[in-house]
Amino acid sequence: LDISYRELRERNRKLMKILTKGKEIKITTKKGTDLVMNIKGRKCFDDNGIYNKKGSFGNLPSGEVAVAPVEGTTNGVYVVDASFGGFGKLKNPLKIKVKNGYAIEIKGYKAKSIEKHLKNKKYRNIAEFGIGTNPKAKVNGCVLEDEKVIGTAHIALGNNISLGGKVSVPLHLDGVIKKPTVWVDEKKIMDKGKLVV
């Protein structure tokens, strides 16, 4: 909580500008993440911690920008190696294979337990892509803070209504990824966890 919200707002503003104009996101990691998603026309969410207008909202600690990928467009694999919603800090990575916007295969740490929560196909929807922007947040197993850590990205399954998506289900599970490389329309915005914009 003890951060410069002015600096956070500026960091978020730069990312928001790129994501709002963007059409496609690609994310990779050394651990095997290689995922592509369409975000054309999607509004971005700016969690900058400044809630001074009527109707504004967010959560604390703040520090992320996020977008709901267009349903049915995400393909590839992502490897969660920090934490996963409802399961906390991961002892070993979790590998999630995605086809046409849905998680079709989950392997690794706690995979069987996670699968039990994903019986409904819509729960497997790729609901969110986000980038952490808080320099003082630390990975501790509480996904609400973990997803804000600068140098991470997160991908969520399930509900995306609050982000302007179309899938309404009673589930939203974030998977936090350390040190990703991220491109928006072939412009690199993060290199192995370091913001380069």
Give the location of each predicted region.
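Active-site bordering "gate/hinge" segments
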Residues: 1-87, 91, 95, 183-192, ...
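Structural motif
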Residues: 24-26, 75-77, 95, 104, ...
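Short, solvent-exposed amphipathic alpha-helical segments in soluble enzyme
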Residues: 42-44, 94-97, 145-146, 171-172
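Short, catalytically relevant binding-site loops at active-site mouths
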Residues: 44, 84-87, 110-112, 135-137
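Active-site proximal loops enriched in glycine and acidic residues that flank catalytic Cys/His/Asp
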Residues: 80-82, 98-100, 107-110, 133, ...
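Composition- and surface-driven signal marking solvent-exposed, interaction-prone regions
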Residues: 90-93, 108-119, 143-144, 168-170
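A beta-strand-loop signature enriched in Asp, Gly, Thr, and Trp
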Residues: 100-135
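Cysteine/selenocysteine-centered motifs that mediate thiol-based redox chemistry or coordinate metal-sulfur cofactors
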Residues: 123-180
